[in-house]
Amino acid sequence: MKEVMIVVGAGQISMAIARRMGASKKIILGDKNIENAKNIQKTMVDAGFDVEVIEMDLSSRQDILKMIDMAKNYGLIKMLVNGAGVSPSQAPIEAILKVDLYGTAVLLEEVGKVIEEGGVGVTISSQSGWRMEQLTALEDEQLACTPTEELLDLEILQPENIKDTLHAYQLAKRCNEKRVMAESVK
């Protein structure tokens, strides 16, 4: 069985990482837009990579689990690349929190349960999480450690506490950094 790389988000950054790190691996590429995933698949297969695609929504735990199950059928999961997300200029606050914040937290949690010892992962994020007012130590801890199904219930993430889509995006990116830190030591 091959080592498996899970790639979420069929964009150019994800493809560049997969091309650099995915030689001799089975690559499972998931995206909400299956046509985007198929286009990246074709480019990569034409270049000699072994890629399968799956339609999946990062905001859905069920879709994440379906993708992980697919990956496990091909071998040992050794790598995760998360390049999925929505833009603050193109999505409402609720979608930003559900995809960029909650979805990334669920993905890290679920892949963390199955990735092989010595496995690696990268979550493409943004410096935007550092371009807002400083959070308290408690807020940072909550973003890092709150169980995923309770994450969107945090006071800091309630609509009345979020100024606009940019602020939601900044909070999501801060949460991404904190979740990666917390998951990396489990």
Q: Which residues fall in each region the model found?
A:
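Rossmann-fold cofactor-recognition segment
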Residues: 44-62
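Conserved glycine-rich Rossmann-like NAD(P)H-binding loop of the short-chain dehydrogenase/reductase
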Residues: 24-39
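A glycine-rich helix->loop->beta "capping" turn
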Residues: 49-50, 70-82, 89-90, 116-119
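Conserved Rossmann-fold cofactor-binding substructure of NAD(P)-dependent oxidoreductases
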Residues: 59-75
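Canonical Rossmann dinucleotide-binding motif of NAD(H)/NADP(H)-dependent dehydrogenases/reductases
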Residues: 1-28
